[in-house]
């Protein structure tokens, strides 16, 4: 769980997302409140419910990007799901309780990594012994082992190939639900793995280099030192208290006025979401999980429908409303130049792999922003995503010929931008299909 203050969270989001200060503030406060709640007296802690958020704004203004960056910052179980992927209980498809089961799986992964880090030093010692066993055998004299140990630590044997035995992770195939027992998920071909574990675990032989073997061996030895029951218990607790669910495209399940057919199913998904958002208990293969304190952040463009088209009960469970504003020319300029992984920086780095030095003048950046704004206003407003389309069009020739132009420098100015997309941007009929 992150201990960042709201101001630190906002400044971290500012590195990747331009503008939308209100939305950043809302998620920063919500994230900080998770930490504040943990500091309370247990009797009061259960009474403090998360204030769920509804983000409203056109496509391409940063709703999904805020969720992606928040996931990395949170240090807590976090899952982003599309509301349109789920169907009403009784219909073919995934039911909404699967969201919580997937969230627990994320929690299991986080806790397991944390536990592995705690025992890494001890696991490294055991891994080194196993590498030595593979190199000199188990019957070698102590002097021989020490001689090889010194070479191993000096990196002299890094490229030598050895055979090691590591735990077999199974087929990795999906599973199926046991009828009448939601959450009781059985792997299709993992029954043999279950029996294998009961008889001491299955292993497989792998041929690899000494250096590469450490990753598998340290993971193997770490897993022997950690208790799976403790991991499951901690993951369920972490999911219940710190879990965050980001529900994207919530506007697509809003029933429109006079809607028939699909609208009924959409309303069914909303009704199924209600208990989840308010607080219920979901059965998972790791035990029951309470959703009372899981934070839900919903987002949608609401082009066709409006937030008031959602079920009144669901609206009431999303008390914090944040509106994200459309992007203007200055925002596009800043997106191209100021963000940590800006498009211009990405394209420069890509061209540097071909020994091509790519430079953009200030007026070129202005021209790119102008074209993006014009297309968004005349064709369809897709926000910052328009910049990727325009940039690809401008750099098409350079990307194609880059291998033949290694060692040269290319400067892109406003004239170059206009030459490659200017005419097309002015012709609205054409740009509908090409940009």
Curated annotation (Swiss-Prot):
Q: Which Gene3D superfamilies match?
A: 1.10.8.60, DNA helicase RuvA subunit, C-terminal domain (1.10.8.10), P-loop containing nucleotide triphosphate hydrolases (3.40.50.300)
Taken from the record, one Pfam family name reads AAA
Which BP terms does GO give this entry? protein unfolding; proteolysis involved in protein catabolic process
* Keyword annotations from UniProtKB, A to Z: ATP-binding, Chaperone, Cytoplasm, Nucleotide-binding, Stress response
**Principal localisation:** cytoplasm
GO cellular component terms attached to this protein's record: HslUV protease complex
Is the keyword Chaperone assigned to this protein? Answer: yes
Q: Name one GO molecular function term.
A: ATP binding
- Record-listed ATP binding positions: 18, 60-65, 248, 313, 385
Work out whether the entry's keyword set contains Heme: no
For this chain, the annotated S-S bridges are: none
Task: Give compartment(s).
Answer: Cytoplasm
Q: Which family does it belong to?
A: Belongs to the ClpX chaperone family. HslU subfamily.
Q: What does this protein do?
A: ATPase subunit of a proteasome-like degradation complex; this subunit has chaperone activity. The binding of ATP and its subsequent hydrolysis by HslU are essential for unfolding of protein substrates subsequently hydrolyzed by HslV. HslU recognizes the N-terminal part of its protein substrates and unfolds these before they are guided to HslV for hydrolysis.
Outline the subunit composition.
A double ring-shaped homohexamer of HslV is capped on each side by a ring-shaped HslU homohexamer. The assembly of the HslU/HslV complex is dependent on binding of ATP.
Q: What is this protein called?
A: ATP-dependent protease ATPase subunit HslU
* Species annotation: Rhizobium leguminosarum bv. trifolii (strain WSM2304)
């Amino acid at each position: 769980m992150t201990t960042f203050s709201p101001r630190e969270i906002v400044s971290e989001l500012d590195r990747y997302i331009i503008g939308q200060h209100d939305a950043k503030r809302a998620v920063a406060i919500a994230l900080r409140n998770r930490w504040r709640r943990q500091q309370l007296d247990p009797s009061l802690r259960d009474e403090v419910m998360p204030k769920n958020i509804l983000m409203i704004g056109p496509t391409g203004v940063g709703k999904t990007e805020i969720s992606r960056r928040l996931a990395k910052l949170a240090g807590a179980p976090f899952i982003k799901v599309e509301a349109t992927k789920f169907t009403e209980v009784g219909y073919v498809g995934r039911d909404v309780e699967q969201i919580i089961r997937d969230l627990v799986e994320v929690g299991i992964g986080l806790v397991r990594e944390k536990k592995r880090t705690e025992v890494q030093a001890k696991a490294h010692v055991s891994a080194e012994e196993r590498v030595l066993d593979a190199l000199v055998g188990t019957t070698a004299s102590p002097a021989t082992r020490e001689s090889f140990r010194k070479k191993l630590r000096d990196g002299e044997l890094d490229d030598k190939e050895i055979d090691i035995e590591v735990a077999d992770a199974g087929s990795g195939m999906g599973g199926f639900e046991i009828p009448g027992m939601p959450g009781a998920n059985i792997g299709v071909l993992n029954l043999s793995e279950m029996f294998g574990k009961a008889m001491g675990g299955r292993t497989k032989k792998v041929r690899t280099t000494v250096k590469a073997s450490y990753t598998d061996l340290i993971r193997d030895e770490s897993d022997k030192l950690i208790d799976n029951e403790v991991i499951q218990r901690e993951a369920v607790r972490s999911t219940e208290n710190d879990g965050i669910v980001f529900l994207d495209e919530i506007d697509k399940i809003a029933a429109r006025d006079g809607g028939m057919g699909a609208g009924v199913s959409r309303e069914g998904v909303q009704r199924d979401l209600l208990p989840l958002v308010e607080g219920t208990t979901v059965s998972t293969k790791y035990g029951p999980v309470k959703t009372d304190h899981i934070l839900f952040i919903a987002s949608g463009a609401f082009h066709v429908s409006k937030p008031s088209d959602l079920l009144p009960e669901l609206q009431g469970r999303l008390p914090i409303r944040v509106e994200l504003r459309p992007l203007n020319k200055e925002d596009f300029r800043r997106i191209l130049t100021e963000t940590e992984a800006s498009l211009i920086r990405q394209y420069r780095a890509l061209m540097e792999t071909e020994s091509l030095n790519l430079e953009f003048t200030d007026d070129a950046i202005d021209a790119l922003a102008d074209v993006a704004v014009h297309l968004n206003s005349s064709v369809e407003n897709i926000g910052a995503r328009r910049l990727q389309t325009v940039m690809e069009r401008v750099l098409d020739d350079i990307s194609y010929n880059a291998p033949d132009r290694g060692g040269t420098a290319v400067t892109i100015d406003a004239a170059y931008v206009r030459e490659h997309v200017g005419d097309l941007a002015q012709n609205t009929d054409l740009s509908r299909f090409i940009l």
